[in-house]
Structures are given as structure tokens and as C-alpha cells.
Amino acid sequence: MGETAQIQAKFFTKDERYSVPDTPFSIAGSTTPEQLSSLINALLKESSASPDQDEQPAFDFLINGELLRLTLEEHLETKEIPQETIVHLEYLEKCPPPSPVDSLIHDDWVSAVHASEAGILSGCYDNTLHIWDTATGTRRLTIPGHLGPIKSVKWVAVAEPPCTFVSTSHDETAMLWQWDRRTNAVESVQVCRGHARSVDCVDVSWNGAKFVTGSFDHMLKVWSADPDSTDTDHGQDGSEEGSRKKQKTVDGKAKTRVPVLTLAGHHEAVTGVQWTDEGEVATCSMDHTLRIWDVELGGMKSQLAGSKAFLGISYSRLNRQIVSASSDRHVRLWDPRTKDGTIVKCSYTSHAGWVSAVHWAPNSDHQFISGSYDTLMKLWDARSPKAPLYDMSGHEDKVLAVDWSLGKYMISGGADNQLKIFEHK
């Protein structure tokens, strides 16, 4: 295509505040997204549809559902779209850049994080858990208890006191805790035993009744999340833990809890787990597979094959899709409902090291974050596979964990002993 190519384009938007006339415009092929944004603002000014404000909004543009990151001409050539056709450009307000809010210092690697209205829960390689005040960044509590590095943490219930959360560790256990926000007292109420190696990941069911753990022992285990449950847990898999007697209390300390269900099938460490429905769980593993499990029937439903070891996954309830972190620098988008078992919907390439963690936005079906050994956390739009929206720098060593459970805050934990908080506007 020549530099002087003229392209016929129509603009449309779902945001009525910024609508412009639905007429074709002749636009130079060399026009950039920034120049298109200026054009929309000029049209808005002409039609007086623009809000009464000095600052002009910046816009992003979509062609056939993909964000425009090149000139119009380059994009059409890349996508093999004939330049003679009328190009329909959807535009939307541009996502503002995240701003750094705080850096919370730990004494060792920060390997786990989960934020809620109750506060930020973090796990450390010095075997300790921490609860932080989200608004002020002050440490509420440092909690010893595990005998090995913390691998994952998750709030279970925060609506009513006391708050409940679960932690997993290299010490082969998961622990269920209760924390009183008013008195700042914390208690370990259940020690969950059954795994034979490091317990590397955890997720809580949507109704808060159960949680599921994945381990370096290749196993997936489902547990009751009720702190007061004293029922005998009969394993549906016929394993020995299911036949044990009721939970025991030793010297008044935390009771020992056994799993409700054990699921075997992975051939290597289970590195990520997510509830995808009340009775369904997705896992990823170092064995290069994603698997979907039916925890009601106690078996595997489907398997998606990857090409590299998976290090983490995140499931979006809004779009019902999974993003995965891998040991080959790429983030991948999967549809767990696919039947052929191999379809990767999209790959996102920008990191320069292993991608250690991913997390969907809680209130957007397009945005997610990733953390990598290259020290960066990145904000992505699923419609822009070639480049992230923004890089969030600040870590001085590899990023080990990320969290975007609160819409306002994107959080990363790193091997530089820091927990970084960025605000999403």
C-alpha cells in the first residue's frame, strides 16, 4: 500500500456521550490511533456532543474486535483486509495508566497475595502471613504458624466477623484461620493434612463452602471451608484419608482436617487452580495440560493441551475464559468449553522472562494482569495481543504473585521482598 492511500471509515461507539455522525470518512492510511482520537474529538466539538470540559478524552479503536495498535494501513495489511472496503471503527474511552500507590516491605520473598474489603493478605518465604490495611498500607498482623514458605493465600469469608482465610505452604499443609478485625486476634482453626509435597495453589468455591488445593504431589484435594465442621470426611475416591475418624484436637490446638475428595490425573505438579462453577474446577500443571474437573462426580471432564509448563491460571466469571501463565514468556487465552482440546484462542507476547502469575480484572471481561520473572507486571486488554496496555515497573527481582481481586488495586509480590500496589482508575 502507498503512503497516500485513502481509506473509507465509519465510526461508532457504545458510549452515547461520545457518538458522532454515522457517515463514511476518507482517512489517510498513515493515520495513527492517536490521530484518530484527535479526529473524534474534533467531530465531537463540531457536533457539540462533547461534555463541557477542557480536557479532551483519549480514545482507543477496535477493528473487528481487535485494538488498533498500528497505522490504519499497516493494520489492514496485517489482517489482510482489502483497503477498498469501508472499515468500521469502534471507539471507546482509553484506559488511563495505572499509578503506583505503595510498596509494602517484607522480610523475604512475597510469594502469595489476595486482597479483599478486609485487607490485603500476603504470604512470605520466611513462613509468615501478613494482613495489611488497604487504605493506609500499615501492617495489621504478622502471623507465624507454617513450617515452610507460604505458596498461596485466599480470603474465604469477610462479610461477617470473624473473617476466615486459608493459606498453603511448602510444609505440605493448608491452614484455615479466623481473624477478628476489631480485636486483631487471629487463630488457626484447622490444619488440613493429606498432601505429600508442597501445597502450591488454592481457590475458594463461589459460595465459600469449600476450597480446593493443588500440590507438587500431582494431586488435587477438596476441603470443607467451614471452620466449625466436625463431620468425618469420607473420601469419594476410596483413599485412606476418607476412612479416618473425626477430626482430632491435640492439646487444644488447631484440629486436623482431612479432604472431602482427592482427584488424581496430573503427571506433574499442580501449579494453579480456579473454581469455574460451583461444581467445577480448572487446574494447570507442569505437565503442560489444563484440566477441567467435576468435583461433584469426582472425575475429569476435559483436558486442554499446552506446549510448555503452566505456572498459573485465572478464570473470568464475566467471559468464562481462562488466561494462563507459562514458562515460555507467553500469556495464553483459552475457552474451557472447547471440545477439541487444543484451541488457544490468543497468545499475548511481551514479557522477557517466565510468566509466573495472571489475574483477570474483577469488573472487566477484557482486561487482565500478568507478572513475570522479568520484574514487570503488565496490564493487558484481551483484544490487543501484540502489546500490553501498560507496564508496571518497580520490582528489583522477579514477580512471583499478582492479584486484581479489588477493582481499584492491582497488586504484585516479588523476590525483592516487596508488595507493590498500583491504582486502576
Swiss-Prot record:
Keyword rRNA processing: yes
Single GO term (MF): ribonucleoprotein complex binding
Compartment(s): Nucleus, Nucleolus; Nucleus, Nucleoplasm
Alphabetical list of InterPro entries matching this protein: G-protein_beta_WD-40_rep, NLE, WD40/YVTN_repeat-like_dom_sf, WD40_repeat_CS, WD40_repeat_dom_sf, WD40_rpt, WDR12/Ytm1
GO cellular component: nucleolus; nucleoplasm; preribosome, large subunit precursor
Gene Ontology biological-process annotations: maturation of 5.8S rRNA from tricistronic rRNA transcript (SSU-rRNA, 5.8S rRNA, LSU-rRNA); maturation of LSU-rRNA from tricistronic rRNA transcript (SSU-rRNA, 5.8S rRNA, LSU-rRNA)
PROSITE patterns: WD_REPEATS_1, WD_REPEATS_2, WD_REPEATS_REGION
WD repeats: 105-142, 145-187, 194-233, 265-303, 305-344, 350-390, 394-425
Keyword annotations from UniProtKB, A to Z: Nucleus, Repeat, Ribosome biogenesis, rRNA processing, WD repeat
Region span, Disordered: 227-253
UniProt cross-references to SMART domains, sorted A to Z: WD40
Main location: nucleus
Basic and acidic residues bias: start-end ranges: 231-253
Function: Required for maturation of ribosomal RNAs and formation of the large ribosomal subunit.
Protein name per Swiss-Prot or TrEMBL: Ribosome biogenesis protein WDR12 homolog
Originating organism: Ixodes scapularis (Black-legged tick)
